[in-house]
From Swiss-Prot:
This is Probable RNA-dependent RNA polymerase 3. It catalyses: RNA(n) + a ribonucleoside 5'-triphosphate = RNA(n+1) + diphosphate. GO terms for molecular function: RNA binding; RNA-directed RNA polymerase activity. It comes from Arabidopsis thaliana. It comes from the Eukaryota. InterPro entries: RNA-dep_RNA_pol_euk-typ. The keyword Transit peptide does not apply. Belongs to the RdRP family. Pfam families: RdRP. The lineage of its organism: Eukaryota, Viridiplantae, Streptophyta, Embryophyta, Tracheophyta. Residues 88-113 are annotated as: Disordered. Its EC number is 2.7.7.48. Keywords: Nucleotidyltransferase, RNA-binding, RNA-directed RNA polymerase, RNA-mediated gene silencing, Transferase. The gene is RDR3.
Length: 992
């Protein structure tokens, strides 16, 4: 490189820049064919600002279509940025301010690589400067004095701009420092957000959002720049968030790189800078830590993310507010940090490394128990034996087991577990006190513990997942786990390393949901001999009853509990609110549309059918074709159909004998809601049913007499695919820490960008081939044979693809199995769709031709009890302003064009207002008395309905979304009607 001016020494050696900055300079030289290097003064300016600002400056230069003077343009962009001690950054290894745990290192990488060793300068190294005779504080340094929530909000409101004096001064930031969060947000929005963001990006906080998980988001562009979003609030949290704290976890989304479907190797070069240097959030650095592949849920996810979520965690910080408190991962590598969660270094392959580690991302509820006082026992799995009592081996040569994923927990520990948990969230109590609603969500004194608990355990380096069966025979404070449940073992060489020990509850065995059929299940039942009239009769009866939804409390209540996404509509009906109440009538109209869409897809209710969690029989008394089913009334007897979603094979529906097992009561007592499978036979019954196991899988159980009369079972599925390939790559323990991070990040990028949706494609092609197959007669034997052969191939591919993420396998869909024409009810392409005459096509057409008449909209009026009750003017004034703010926020959220994101934003707005109203996540968690809530709910109701009278019934929604439980209780109080206690599930049963 040529020298500049009369200097005899290369300016690069005199003024040292970070490797990432040098790399960006080289790119600029190459793109713009700039032969002369930048001047010493320009290098000095670049060295005087943070790495983040220097890179942002050079990106702006790089993106210019042409350059006149490179030095002049850089100096223009740098003007006003933070100066570091008024002098150039020292060369690597010479900084006087270093972390005692992480000495600065010299980078030995080639010039095109990006350095990851150098840290952001310490605040001690960033001083106030004289600026025209007055002192000022650099904005970035001032930001480091704010609590993280405030700092992140400010960064999100500058829309990706650099935090420089031209944007906002450090002194102004300090003036906002002590403002309450609501006032702070308003000030920052008025000064910055309105200028740099669109209205939909505003995040108006409410006081009292504590207790909810804050998800801080970052969006990374292909040029390496990034913008901050959020934060989003949720009632559920992950083990990762609970251990580190919400502000130390960053959810990161990467923009799609054009052409990566065919050039996946280009991905890492695009995002290498982020992988190496991490993401700077002010003066905090966050690095890649973990990602989770959606796997089985992938088809349901937002296609823009393909079900893959990526998380970075904070490593180090030079923010003054952070320097006051020690941070466990300061100066540690990501691999070292992971060891505090589980000893993933013991795993044999990289795919296993990340799939196991992602267990910390499950949405869970922590069991509040002292882990040091629990006895952990390892018991053997129950092996499958042949007629000679020898172990049966699977296609990979491993023993088949009956107990895959299930163990035991002592009764005292099970009683400590909260009931009615689903995916880490406390569901509303299933006990509805009709005419006297009881929403406390607590069972009666002495309530039985959950029969089954789906969980995650992190303990001394171990990671365990599966289900616990409550076992009254175990001594107190004891859990028993099997090898099939242990996903990560302890590394005894790390015995002195502290670990984040916890028992996390995912889901408990809850009262069964209203069972509905599905397209897959209808197709398999039809193949098994169930006549079309069986399905069509149920369908017609359901459609006829739906006609009375606006006039019959029975029909309205059934629709509310079957199709409502909350319980408030059902509550309104149960307390006697008239069906023509404007909001309730509008909700019933919505439920009618929801029901019709569900019926079109074959999702209609079926009598005497349930979805319940499965486990293995602890007594050993059940025979090969027997199961034990415990429902509300206890154990049932007789033949039942058993199926598991998303089964596609003809033999995925079994006919089994439900058997009473007296000895089981000695284990579980009176606990309810589970199905027990035998521990006898050459193959697990759970595995025979769509490859199921007992780590939380839900099984469809039906004792519907007409189904049992007609259905003829087929032979169960046996995989015909080849044995899994043996992993030949290097073990995680054989990689250097730098190599490990690079490989893990590449795995994430491939999962995020390069993977075809084989699961969804195989399922769609299966249905497209299966549909005509159902209508073929014996005269079409050859076509039936060919179609069945392809169906079986697709089933193998589908099941292999479901398990691929955790095995690191690659599954492809051969072109000869891909189809272009689909049945019309799938609504893919009207020009290509064929007219289906199968039961699925008949179901779709029957619903489509059924025009339910809806009554005309009612004039909006208030309920007399709510309008007549006096409400303090102070409450009316408060909620008038409150409602105006809500409408403003909701209109901004509705501007989002992406449906998934829009729903997320609108739900967040509603949740935050509920949090503010109750001082908690909802009514069930609130410590406020009803006497305090009644006048506030009535004020909100009257304010909202006054507005709705002018603007339409849709505006009524807010009052019920927020204050619905309180309004129902108040209405019941005013009617002075008698009440009875009833369970939702029992009401469903009584109503048919």
């Amino acid at each position: 490189m040529m020298n500049n001016g009369c200097d005899e020494v290369s300016p690069r050696s005199e003024i040292a820049l970070l490797g990432s900055v040098e790399t960006m300079l080289e790119k600029i030289y190459e793109k713009h064919n700039h032969r002369l290097p930048i001047s010493v003064e320009t290098r000095r300016k670049l060295s005087s600002i943070s790495e983040e600002l220097a890179l942002e400056t050079l990106r702006k230069v790089f993106n210019k279509p042409y350059l006149k003077t490179l030095d002049g343009l850089i100096m223009y962009f740098v003007k006003g940025t933070v100066t570091v001690d008024g002098s150039p950054r020292l060369s690597p290894g010479e900084s006087p301010v270093q972390s005692p745990r992480t000495p600065a290192k010299k980078s030995c990488r080639a010039s095109q690589d990006v350095s990851l060793d150098l840290e952001t300068p310490s605040p001690k190294f960033m001083k106030r400067e004289e600026n025209g005779g007055s002192k000022y504080i650099p904005p970035l340094l001032a930001l480091g004095e704010l609590e993280f929530k405030k700092a992140f909000l400010l960064l999100s409101y500058i829309g990706g701009e650099s935090l420089v004096e031209e944007v906002i001064s450090g002194d102004q930031i300090r003036k906002w420092k002590d403002l309450p969060m609501v006032s702070y947000e308003a000030a920052v929005w008025n000064r910055l957000g309105q200028r740099y963001c669109s209205p939909k990006e505003r995040r108006r906080p409410l006081e009292g959002d504590s207790g909810m998980t804050h998800y801080y988001q970052c969006h990374v562009a292909t040029d390496g720049s990034y913008k901050f979003k959020g934060h989003l609030l949720e009632n559920t949290g992950t083990h990762l968030h609970k251990v580190l704290g919400d502000d130390n976890v960053l959810t990161v989304k990467f923009d799609k790189v054009l052409g990566v479907e065919t050039y996946c190797n280009d991905l890492y070069s695009t995002y290498k800078g982020i992988a190496k240097n991490g993401i700077m959030v002010g003066l905090r650095r966050y690095r890649f830590f973990v990602f989770k592949d959606g796997g089985k849920e992938e088809k349901k996810k937002d296609v823009s993310t393909k079900g893959v979520k990526c998380y970075f965690i904070r490593t180090d910080s030079t923010a003054s507010i952070d320097m006051q408190n020690p941070y466990i991962f300061a100066g540690k590598s990501m691999h070292e940090a992971r060891m505090h969660f589980m000893h993933v270094n013991t795993l044999s392959s990289l795919p296993n490394y990340m799939s196991r580690f992602s267990l910390i991302l499950s949405k869970t509820k922590t069991l509040e128990v002292d882990m040091t006082g629990i006895t952990f026992e390892q018991i053997d799995d129950i092996h499958c034996h042949d007629q000679d009592d020898k172990d049966v081996l699977d296609k990979n040569g491993k023993p088949c087991i009956h107990s895959d994923g299930t163990g035991y927990i002592s009764e005292d520990l099970a009683r400590m577990c909260p009931v009615n948990i689903f995916k880490g969230k406390s569901m509303r109590s299933n006990n509805i006190q009709s005419k006297n609603l009881n929403f406390e969500g607590q069972g009666p004194c002495g309530q039985e513990p959950p029969l089954l608990i789906q969980f995650r355990i992190f303990y001394n380096g171990y990671a365990v997942k599966g289900t616990f069966l409550t076992n009254k025979k175990l001594p107190p404070r004891t859990v028993q786990v099997r090898p099939s449940m242990i996903k990560v073992y302890e590394d005894r060489t790390l015995s002195n390393l502290s670990t984040f020990n916890s028992l996390e509850v995912v889901t408990t065995s809850n009262p069964p949901r209203k069972a509905r059929l599905s397209r897959n299940l209808v197709a398999l039942l039809s193949y098994g001999g169930v006549p079309n009239d069986f399905f069509l009769n149920i369908l017609r009866n359901t459609l006829e009853e739906s006609k009375t939804i606006f006039y019959s409390e029975r029909a309205a209540f059934k629709a509310a509990i079957n199709y409502g996404d909350d319980q408030y509509t059902a509550d309104m009906i149960l307390v006697g609110i008239p069906l023509d109440e404007p909001y309730l009538k509008d909700r019933l109209s919505y439920l009618l549309k929801t029901e019709r869409n569900a019926l079109k897809a074959g999702r209609f209710p079926i009598d005497e059918s349930y979805y319940i969690m499965g486990t293995v029989d602890p007594t050993g008394e059940l025979k090969e074709n027997e199961i034990c089913v415990i429902l509300h009334s206890g154990q049932i007897s007789g033949d039942v159909l058993v199926y598991r979603n998303p089964g596609l094979h003809f033999g995925d529906i079994h006919v089994l004998k439900a058997t009473y097992v007296k000895a089981l009561e000695d284990y579980v007592g009176n606990a309810k809601f589970a199905v027990f499978f035998p521990q006898k036979g050459p193959r697990s019954l759970g595995d025979e049913i769509a490859g199921g196991d007992f780590d939380g899988d839900m099984y469809f159980i039906s004792r519907n007499p007409k189904l049992l009369e007609h259905f003829k079972p087929s032979e169960p599925w046996v995989s015909s695919s080849k044995p899994s390939k043996i992993y030949c790559g290097r073990k995680p323990s054989e990689l250097s820490e730098e190599e490990l991070e690079e490989e893990l990040f590449k795995m994430f990028l491939k999962a995020r960008f390069c993977k075809r949706d084989v699961i969804g494609m195989a399922a769609d092609c299966w249905l497209g081939i299966m549909d005509p197959f159902l209508t073929l007669g014996d005269e079409s034997a050859k076509e039936k044979y060919e179609r069945k052969k392809n169906i079986l191939k697709l089933i193998d591919i589908y099941y292999d693809a479901l398990d691929a993420p955790k095995k690191g396998a690659k599954v492809d869909l051969p072109p000869d199995l891909e189809i272009k024409n689909f049945p019309h009810y799938m609504e893919r392409d009207p020009k290509r769709d064929f007219r289906s005459t199968s039961i699925l096509g008949l179901i779709f057409d029957t619903v489509d031709s059924h025009n339910a008449e809806e009554p005309p909209p009612s004039e909006i009026s208030k309920l007399w009890y709510f309008e007549d009750e006096p409400v303090p003017k102070s409450h009316m004034d408060k909620f008038t302003s409150w409602y105006e703010n809500y409408r403003s926020e909701m209109s901004q959220a509705m501007m989002e064009t992406d449906k998934v994101k829009r729903n997320q934003l609108t739900n967040e707005v509603i949740q935050r207002y509920k949090q503010d109203f109750y001082g908690a996540a909802g009514f069930e968690d609130s410590n406020k008395s009803l006497e305090e809530l009644y006048p506030q709910a009535l004020a909100l109701y009257n304010v909202v309905y006054d507005y709705a009278i002018q603007e339409g019934v849709a505006k009524c929604t807010f009052a019920w979304n927020v204050a619905g439980p309180v309004l129902c209780k108040f209405y019941l109080k005013k009617t002075k009607d008698k009440s009875v206690v009833a369970s939702t599930s029992v009401l469903k049963k009584l109503l048919g």
